[in-house]
Amino acid sequence: MLGWALIFLIVAIIAGTLGFSGVAGAASWIAQVLFLVFLALLVISLLGGRRV
């Protein structure tokens, strides 16, 4: 249990430093772009209608 607590502490520290720098904004923008790309691919595949 102590090992897991230390791992989560390290992950929380890394996430905190990335959140307070400027990396979080860039990661959010990349996530939005990827969401739109995969949403477009979903719509195209649904409209294509070919079953595999």
From Swiss-Prot:
The lineage of its organism: Bacteria, Pseudomonadati, Pseudomonadota, Gammaproteobacteria, Chromatiales. The chain crosses the membrane at residues 4-24, 29-49. GO terms for cellular component: plasma membrane. Belongs to the UPF0391 family. It is a multi-pass membrane protein. This is UPF0391 membrane protein Tgr7_2500. Keywords: Cell membrane, Membrane, Transmembrane, Transmembrane helix. It is found in: Cell membrane. It comes from the Bacteria.
